[in-house]
Amino acid sequence: KVQQLLKDYFDGKEPNKGVNPDEAVAYGAAVQGGILSGEGGDETKDILLLDVAPLTLGIETVGGVMTKLIPRNTVIPTKKSQVFTTYQDQQTTVSIQVFEGERSLTKDCRLLGKFDLTGIAPAPRGTPQIEVTFEVDANGILNVKAEDKGTGKSEKITITNDKGRLSQEEIERMVREAEEFAEEDKKVKERIDARNSLETYVYNMKNQINDKDKLADKLESDEKEKIETATKEALEWLDDNQSAEKEDYEEKLKEVEAICNPIITAVYQRSGGAPGGGSSEEEEDGHDEL
């Protein structure tokens, strides 16, 4: 009845029925205080207040991509692990850069801390497995650990929630910006992914044709020469087209696959095995590169 009277008085305008955010915070703090002190009584005994991660947490991977491990609003405490790999042949060190934010690229997110994991056994690009674990405790303290699964070597960093962390207003601003630039960020991320897919395929083929456990001893000399020429030309094209569009990278990948995949298929048919390694299906199951 009162709401209808107000609506009539203000020329049909609907009254605001939402909750004042400042009041909501005050009520929540009061309830939490009552629960923690044990003085909440019957009013709070069935209430469960959950803390959440205010922003997405992740690390930087090739191309400046923000690879997300713990999404925004994940209930804490929480723990998440993901396996990554190396970007270059014989790479013995990876840099772990920890960010928070909602954008697709780390340049638009906030750096929380970084550390290096050294002593990785030299191997072809994409071979080492680096497991990165994010763990946020009930107090919001973030522990990040990186471990080389091959050598067992590891490094870690602890990021507390009292070292210049963002205010609620800054968090809301970052979320708004992510929504505002979502379409633009998506296009940039797709272009980087397309470039990485081409690069990964080419290096995968190069490694296979030189690895005796894979294709080195199974290829005819002319077959190997065709693949070497195709991969060499593709790498030169990548060097000359650093800022190509997504469609350009995808087209170049199709060109290289059209040369390499039939050769790989023929080799495995001759040897009675199944095609492997160079296919784009396997490529999609690969690990992000550091």
UniProtKB/Swiss-Prot annotation:
The answer to whether the entry has keyword Glycoprotein is yes
Q: Which GO terms describe its molecular function?
A: ATP binding; ATP-dependent protein folding chaperone
The terms describing its cellular component in GO are:
endoplasmic reticulum lumen
Q: Which Pfam families match?
A: HSP70
Instruction: List where the motif Prevents secretion from ER lies.
Output: 287-290
The listed locations are: Endoplasmic reticulum lumen
Record field: compositional bias (Acidic residues): 280-290
Q: Which residues are glycosylated?
A: 241
Concerning its family, UniProt says: Belongs to the heat shock protein 70 family.
UniProt xrefs under PANTHER family: HEAT SHOCK PROTEIN 70KDA (PTHR19375)
Q: What is this protein called?
A: Luminal-binding protein 1
